[in-house]
Amino acid sequence: MLDKLKESLRNSPVIKKGEYDYFVNPVTDGIPLTEPELLEEVAEEIVRRFRPEADKIICIEAMGIHHATVLSLKTGIPFVVVRKRRYGLPGEVAVHQMTGYSEGELYINGVDSGDRVVVIDDVVSTGGTLLAVLEALREMDVDVRDVITVIDKGEGSRVVRERTGFTVKSLVKVDVIDGRVKVEDIPAGGPHD
């Protein structure tokens, strides 16, 4: 299971961003080449394991977009993108995010009080992006049904759970050891389900 995902992760180059070990992968960066079979495998496993039920899928720019697109096509659930750019639309909510290697503003549009949503992103690492978005959605009185990432790296999922009460569900857990990506399965029914 998830053979393409695991192989792509194990073959990922690792670079340093300050003190942060950053792996470069099609799932998290769109480079090297993102094969459609990889996206298909990831989306099928998300649907199989987590069976998203919601009015909307919320993804975070930029690397959540391709996962939300494929998931939307598989489930028939429309998606909306939390953007890094302000549009000034009525009801727009600005969110300040801090990660292990950057900080900035995100903007939520097209999400209303009472909406039932699934939040999807490529990876949870420090938890900074998910924390900011989930806290904003809570303030907006949005019904967050699930929080799903393809990859769990570091302590971010624990931080998100402790600070928001939401369990981040992921397909695999990774760690960077001696400049290489190590991949660990998270079995269905495992700690994130």
UniProtKB/Swiss-Prot annotation:
Describe, as the record does, how this protein assembles with itself and its partners: Homodimer.
Q: Which UniProt keywords apply?
A: Cytoplasm, Glycosyltransferase, Purine salvage, Transferase
The record lists the lineage as:
Archaea, Methanobacteriati, Methanobacteriota, Methanomada group, Methanobacteria
Task: Please name the PROSITE patterns in this protein's record.
Answer: PUR_PYR_PR_TRANSFER
Q: Which Gene3D superfamilies match?
A: 3.40.50.2020
Q: What is its EC number?
A: 2.4.2.8
Q: Where are the transmembrane segments?
A: none
The protein's enzyme class: transferase
GO cellular-component term (any): cytoplasm
Stated name of the protein:
Hypoxanthine/guanine phosphoribosyltransferase
Gene label? hpt
Quote the subcellular location field of this record: Cytoplasm
As its record notes, the protein acts as a catalyst of:
IMP + diphosphate = hypoxanthine + 5-phospho-alpha-D-ribose 1-diphosphate; GMP + diphosphate = guanine + 5-phospho-alpha-D-ribose 1-diphosphate
Biological or metabolic pathway of the protein = Purine metabolism; IMP biosynthesis via salvage pathway; IMP from hypoxanthine: step 1/1
Family membership noted in the UniProt record: Belongs to the purine/pyrimidine phosphoribosyltransferase family. Archaeal HPRT subfamily.
**Per its database record, what is this protein's job?**
Catalyzes a salvage reaction resulting in the formation of IMP that is energically less costly than de novo synthesis.
Return one Gene Ontology term, BP aspect.
purine ribonucleoside salvage
Gene Ontology molecular function, alphabetical? guanine phosphoribosyltransferase activity; hypoxanthine phosphoribosyltransferase activity
A UniProt-annotated Pfam family = Pribosyltran
Domain of life the protein comes from: Archaea
Under InterPro entries, the record lists: HGPRTase-like, PRibTrfase_dom, PRTase-like, Pur/Pyrimidine_PRTase
